[in-house]
Amino acid sequence: MTDVVPDSNAPAYSVSELAFALKRTLETSYAFVRLRGELSKVTHHGNGHVYLTIKDDKSAIDGVVWKGNVRGLGIRPEHGLEVIVTGKITTYPAGSRYQIVIETMEAAGVGALLAQLERLKAKLNAEGLFAPDRKRPLPSMPAVVGVITSPTGAVIRDILHRIRDRWPCQVLVWPCVVQGDAAAGQVSAAIRGFNALTPGGPVPRPDILIVARGGGSVEDLWAFNDEGLARTVAEGTIPLISAVGHETDTTLIDFVSDRRAPTPTAAAEMATPVLAELRALVSDYDRRLNNCGGRAVEERRTRLTSAARGLPRPADLLALAQQRLDLAVRGLPRLDDLTAPAERRFKEAAARLDTALQRNTDIHARDLLKVTARLSPDTLHRQRADAGRRVGDLGRRLDLAARRVPERVAQHARLPALQDRLNAVARRRLERETDRLAGLEKLRQSLNPTRPLELGFALVHKADGGIARSASELASGERVRLQFRQGDRDAVIDGESSGVLPPSAAPAPTRPTPRPKPASSSDQGSLF
């Protein structure tokens, strides 16, 4: 028979009440705990939190690093890393599990740090960040040098002093901390800031960068082993020299940078040339160039002198030809003596021709003015107006006759036809006047003194300048000048004159046959 437990007065907890009571007890009793162990099951969540497990050879405890504390850890949580963490113990009521909320984390000894560094080096090397072919050459003569270091201390003074002694250039210093949890982030920001500068902007873009820090322990230099900083150096486009610690100190940034310097002073020497050495080198090149050029010029001058000795003198080559030319010139008459008579005759003929042409031009101009006056448009308009008035008078007379002779109504019906005939008469009169005007225009053209020349005729000028109008005026052998439309020619009269036809023998000019007048219609009535 089962024993019956008597009723108790103790209160009964709900599950939630018990879970939260245990949570308060743990958080109160273990509000600050320093825990050492090995990290495992490290998970970097997308929301920024880090979930992990801390274990030893016998036990394990879950842990979490909230997003706000991840950047302040100083190291990156990785699987297998032995660390010392600080935080508080709490529970997760939904699963009845306890865990530690981590606030700080540090490597448990130098050996752990070096082991983490070796793993990170192997990872980055496998990605090709240490490959020699991605190293950029340093500029030979930089105009701007960017220095990333602490603004105080001996490092920046040594760099500035060394650059000032060697090379005149502008130095831009980006101050940042070089030790502690914030060092890696500030150095990365400085590298990205220098690379973001645009060439030709208000702030000059450096040609080369120097990341420098003095010596220290492994923990002091640990910020330069940060994976994010190493990737920032690899992504930059400006050549970078790392000068962290002493010659025996090696950090992760040394493998990614384009050049490693054992000391900050050595970094300044790598970044800049020596101005005095460059001047000496340029002077030596200039001296060697001048010597080489002088020898080449002297050698060519010697060859040219030797070649010139074998050539004859120009005066000797031209002496015989010059002598023959002088003899030929003495035997020629003077050009002025040959051309003077012809020039005198030409001037006299030109004067006579000008006088004759002017006289003929004046005569023809007066004739042309008379013809033009008769053919002016005003005259033609007056004649046309007179014809119009006569036609109007005839019309009025026809109207008067029609009114006076009522009995001739039948004839009055033919008045439109008569009007048409009168208009035809006026048109014929106008055509005759137009033909007459065309004939006068032809006459005017024929009176143009240069018209015969355009038709192929020529003017014959005698020796005294006058124009020959008859063959009897010219004697055989007499020299004359023929004037054509384009140019003149000299000629000599040959043969005897055959005379001219008498007026009776000349063909009589034919007069154009007048056109017959149209026969008057038989049915045309009398106007009166």
Curated annotation (Swiss-Prot):
GO terms for cellular component: cytoplasm; exodeoxyribonuclease VII complex. It comes from the Bacteria. Signal peptide: none annotated. Its main location: cytoplasm. Residues 486-528 are annotated as: Disordered. It catalyses: Exonucleolytic cleavage in either 5'- to 3'- or 3'- to 5'-direction to yield nucleoside 5'-phosphates. InterPro entries: Exonuc_VII_L, Exonuc_VII_lsu_C, OB-fold_nuc-bd_dom. GO terms for biological process: DNA catabolic process. The keyword Hydrolase applies. Its EC number is 3.1.11.6. Residues 504-517 have a biased composition (Pro residues). Keywords: Cytoplasm, Exonuclease, Hydrolase, Nuclease. It is found in: Cytoplasm. GO terms for molecular function: exodeoxyribonuclease VII activity; nucleic acid binding. Transmembrane segments: none annotated. Heterooligomer composed of large and small subunits. Bidirectionally degrades single-stranded DNA into large acid-insoluble oligonucleotides, which are then degraded further into small acid-soluble oligonucleotides. Belongs to the XseA family. This is Exodeoxyribonuclease 7 large subunit. It comes from Caulobacter sp. (strain K31).
